[in-house]
Regions:
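Positively charged n-region of N-terminal signal peptides that target proteins for export
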Residues: 1-4
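Hydrophobic h-region of N-terminal signal peptides that target proteins for export
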Residues: 10-20
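Short, solvent-exposed aromatic-acidic interface loops
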Residues: 64-71, 136, 267-268, 294-305
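Surface-exposed, charged secondary-structure patches
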Residues: 81, 107, 233-280
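Short, well-ordered alpha-helical segments enriched in acidic and aromatic residues
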Residues: 206-219
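Short beta-strand edge/turn micro-motifs at domain boundaries
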Residues: 276-321
Length: 321
């Protein structure tokens, strides 16, 4: 089934009242596609929760876990902390693959590992974090023990977890303490966010550059641009390329530390440019509404050729919003 943006905006209105009283993590704003899985890790409670969506979000499994030896958010390599934020699982290793690479040192990872996409773009550009090698992995034997920053579960539970994970398509929400709200409350936030994204897209597509730039924070920052240089760049582009079509597919909206992480497949078509890739928007609530504080776009042909990425590319070539 095509996962188009406009279809799910309508779907949200229909689903709000059906499951209004069900509780779910506050960070799980929207990834409402049948069969979708989101992993939610509560560091303080030492548990990894597996949420699955059919008609609504349900907690499918809960696994005891351990995290870094030191509490708090990760900022530096070697600080022994587990990062807090929104991440994706992009690579996996079986135990024998780890043994080939690490030798006897691989025993600590148990039966296998998933790579967590730390540091993500927001971590690097806005929060200036460093370090890497954060995994969800098994354990030597028995129950997991505190780690150098990874998330560890028992080997049996790791094998169970592999049944739910799709590389490139399964997000991970990591929090010090997970909070929950009724689905009806989160649905209101969904509508507000979806409306903002739709208005941003329309302003961009219609070449209304002043309206388009109004969606950006004065603190906007990427690896290449700050707000002033971005504003000048976009005004220049708008005079050269006045007609464009923008399609958004496979949208997800997740939240951590009051930052909304929006990800979608973006297909951009104009008289001079035709491209498709993953766009990430990072939004924050400011006094005058939601604002984009950073964004990043990656061409699909530069990403891992995992089944999830290939599927997203194929889907983006079909009709959408």
């Amino acid at each position: 089934m095509k996962k188009t943006f406009s279809f799910w905006v309508v779907f949200l209105w229909c689903s709000v009242f059906v499951h209004a009283n069900e509780l779910r993590p506050d960070g799980l704003i929207f990834n409402d596609y049948p069969g979708s899985t989101v992993l939610v890790i509560d560091k303080s409670a030492c548990r990894l929760m597996v949420y699955k969506f059919q008609e609504s979000w349900k907690m499918h499994r809960v696994f005891p876990c351990t995290t870094g030896k030191v509490n708090g958010d990760k900022f530096r390599e070697g600080d022994l902390k587990t990062p807090i934020g929104i991440y994706w699982l992009n690579q996996a290793w079986a135990g024998w693959e780890l043994a080939q690479y690490y030798g006897n040192g691989a025993n600590v990872y148990g039966t296998g590992a998933f790579e967590v996409s730390y540091p993500n773009y927001f971590d690097q550009v806005i929060e200036r974090k460093n370090g890497d090698g954060i995994w969800i992995h098994g354990t030597v034997k028995g129950d997991p023990i505190p780690t150098r920053g990874c998330i560890s579960i028992s080997n049996y539970n790791f094998l169970e977890l592999t049944r739910s994970v799709e590389l490139g398509a399964t997000p991970v929400i990591i929090e010090e303490k997970v909070t929950f709200s009724p689905s009806a409350v989160i649905a209101q936030e969904q509508q507000f966010l979806m409306g903002t994204i739709e208005s941003w897209k329309r302003a961009w597509e219609s070449n209304d550059v002043d309206n388009y730039l109004s969606f950006y924070s004065s603190n906007f920052l990427t690896e290449k641009w700050n707000f002033n240089s971005w504003q000048a760049h976009k005004k220049s582009v708008s005079t050269q390329n006045k007609r464009r079509r923008i399609l958004l597919n496979d949208l997800s909206v997740l939240m951590s530390k009051n930052i909304y992480h929006v990800r979608f497949v973006q297909t951009y078509t104009s008289s001079s440019i035709n491209d498709v890739g993953f766009k990430h928007l990072f939004l924050v609530k400011e006094a005058d509404g939601l604002k984009i504080i950073s964004e990043n776009w990656t061409p699909l042909n530069q990403l891992s050729p995992s089944p999830a990425f290939q599927y997203a590319y194929k889907e983006s070539q079909q009709n959408s919003m």
